[in-house]
Amino acid sequence: MYTPIPQSGSPFPASVQDPGLHIWRVEKLKPVPIARENHGIFFSGDSYLVLHNGPEEASHLHLWIGQQSSRDEQGACAVLAVHLNTLLGERPVQHREVQGNESDLFMSYFPQGLKYREGGVESAFHKTTSGTTPAAIRKLYQVKGKKNIRATERALSWDSFNTGDCFILDLGQNIFAWCGGKSNILERNKARDLALAIRDSERQGKAQVEIITDGEEPAEMIQVLGPKPALKEGNPEEDITADQTNAQAAALYKVSDATGQMNLTKVADSSPFASELLIPDDCFVLDNGLCGKIYIWKGRKANEKERQAALQVADGFISRMRYSPNTQVEILPQGRESPIFKQFFKDWK
């Protein structure tokens, strides 16, 4: 149990509303700001809060958990995250980042990469030896299926491609929807729609989207992926298998504290889900843990206790399902749903 933050006074300055990147290291339930010249340096024994305020109130709040950080420190970080999220009107999408398994969005804040250093504030020493990870700001999605079509992130390589599916290569300012010669029309439409959704919701409509057919790859694709080899043949029967796998890889749970404890009730055990299942009065867990990620959706009319317990619910769910501790968590306020989240639902409105 962690001591709540006093109602009077805030440990965060008014500048948390300012655009740009804000980083704090957690020290004894207090956020200590990190100087700009030290952005990108993370100590394995510590936990951090990373806030990015983008245009049009598009804020993202990340909890970064060092591999050697203590449970107490992680809990304190969660308490501060709840306070900061409330201070910002619960606008931010929240993410839990585990050292070595950070999301592409998190990595994009640090174009020079991350530097991991040993030690932490609790251990009273900070070694200067560091290891740098490259900035992973490029993504590749495979779009596959006939009925339950799903985009799944793949390794950034021609080895991930085949002639029977569509792929989205997201390079930030340019988004390529590449369609194999044997891909079906539904996959092609899905790839186009998802590329446009990424442009509109994640790039504020400022990225360029290009539809590419097999054999007409632009120079930028070749520069990123290397010379194009002969690609694997696609198999239409795999689309049927993918439909079954995609449907079974996700489940939807309702969160309730009616009994005084947080309880989960499964409301759908396969996707695509009906969007009407997401009731504004409640919070929900979308379980895609078999693919390494779970989502918490917070209805705008859900009670304060349920909304503030989202991180706690996520941690408990990961433990209960025996998922990897590296499982990524994304907490979405109603109205801030990402294109990847929306693809689990039919007829999203």
Swiss-Prot record:
Is the keyword Ligase assigned to this protein?
Answer: no
InterPro entries on file: ADF-H/Gelsolin-like_dom_sf, Gelsolin-like_dom, Villin/Gelsolin
Q: Which domain of life is it from?
A: Eukaryota
Give its localization: Nucleus; Cytoplasm; Melanosome; Cell projection, Lamellipodium
List of residues that carry N-acetylmethionine: 1
Quote the Gene3D superfamilies the UniProt record gives: Severin
Q: Which UniProt keywords apply?
A: Acetylation, Actin capping, Actin-binding, Cell projection, Cytoplasm, Nucleus, Phosphoprotein, Repeat
Molecular function in Gene Ontology: actin filament binding; phosphatidylinositol-4,5-bisphosphate binding; protein domain specific binding; protein-containing complex binding
Q: Motif (Nuclear localization signal) spans which residues?
A: 138-147
The GO biological-process annotations, alphabetized, read as:
actin filament severing; actin polymerization or depolymerization; barbed-end actin filament capping; cell projection assembly; cellular response to type II interferon; central nervous system development
Residue positions of the PTM Phosphoserine? 338
Q: How is it modified after translation?
A: Phosphorylated.
What the entry lists under SUPFAM superfamilies is as follows: Actin depolymerizing proteins
Q: Name one GO cellular component term.
A: nucleolus
| Primary localization | nucleus
Gelsolin-like repeat locations: 28-107, 147-222, 264-342
The record lists its disulfide bonds as none
Described purpose of this protein according to its UniProt entry = Calcium-sensitive protein which reversibly blocks the barbed ends of actin filaments but does not sever preformed actin filaments. May play an important role in macrophage function. May play a role in regulating cytoplasmic and/or nuclear structures through potential interactions with actin. May bind DNA. Uncapping occurs either when Ca(2+) falls or when the concentration of polyphosphoinositide rises, both at low and high Ca(2+).
Record note on quaternary structure:
Interacts with NUP62. Interacts with NUTF2 and RAN; involved in CAPG nuclear import.
Family as reported in the entry's similarity comment: Belongs to the villin/gelsolin family.
What's this protein's name? Macrophage-capping protein
Q: What's the encoding gene here? A: Capg
